[in-house]
Amino acid sequence: MRELRSICLGILLVLGAFRLTISHEDQPLSKIAIHKAVFALDDNAYIKASPSILGMKGQNSDWLTVEYNSPNPSVGDWIGVFSPSNFSSSTCPAENPRVYPPLLCSAPIKFQYANYSSPQYKSTGKGSLKLQLINQRSDFSFVLFTNGLLNPKVVAVSNKVTFTNPNAPVYPRLAQGKVWNEMTVTWTSGYGINEAEPFVEWGPKGGDRTYSPAGTLTFGRGSMCGAPARTVGWRDPGYIHTGFLRELWPNAMYTYKLGHRLFNGTYIWSSEYQFKASPYPGQDSLQQVIIFGDMGKDEADGSNEYNNFQRGSLNTTRQLIQDLKNIDIVFHIGDICYANGYISQWDQFTAQIEPIASTVPYMIARFVIIHYVAHQLGTALTGPKLDLTL
């Protein structure tokens, strides 16, 4: 019996490792061998982005135009978007002193081929892209690469682009609290507890306002299990804040704003959002619940696309946004955004679901890593705990 258990455990571990290997292929950024990149700067090549300041109207996402030119264009040329804009070897963590660090040790947060919207690029050497950026707590730069994704060469580097306030509180996501009349709101910012005090201003719609303090958490590179999250996929996650809105009246509408009080006395505010409180337990009411899994994420500008693998995720979020008035709560039961060790993709995901998660509770099922194996083999496991883990 003991031998049989050992064999079964071995099979589970092998299948789990196999799943992890396959899932890594789901992430388009994993196709880029950024650690092999070399510099081949060409004075006759250029890349520039405009405008250089984004979010002038307070929005957390914005579009820009990237224009580029290469005297030696090829079908393997591509544009990488880097954030922070400083992506040189000076940002590489010290590892083996006997080995020279790579010239580039951070993967781009998104990429697109140079001929994507300029089909004549190979013959003219000129092209342009319309790209959408989200506020991710740092500035951006754009790089023109040649020689494909596996042996990339840097041909030109652009000017820097930034949002008006890169540290602003963004992407709120609601979750049902531990009791029926409690709601939690979690968001991301660039403000640590040594810079500002996070809080939520909230109250009944049209009524008096109150303030609830928020806790602050973050994590470092050392908290990651291994590559690519500890290496090319690492990106500073900023600070994650959570506030608790308690003693809500059943079925009442509430509005809220995210705030940070800087130690110089000034305040930083988010946009205003709203939600409807839960009904009283046992109340005779119709609750419309959305349950789905394996959604993934995608880019509205078409970047980071690999075999049209995750375009459907945009259709899902758009449909949910369209039907939002008829939705009371969302359960996303695992396989969230397929970041697979590329930390920047979590910001992209929370930005994609913000219109939903800021309005209705967006609950995440917390699975053990072996859930895929359990599904494949029909193994009976304890059900997942529903929790907000974004």
Residue ranges and their predicted role:
Residues R5-T21:
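Cleavable N-terminal signal peptides of Sec/SRP-targeted secreted and luminal proteins
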Residues H24-F39, D43-Y46, L54-M56, W63, ...:
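Divalent metal-dependent phosphoesterase catalytic cores across multiple superfamilies
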Residues Y68:
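Extracellular glycan-modifying ectodomains
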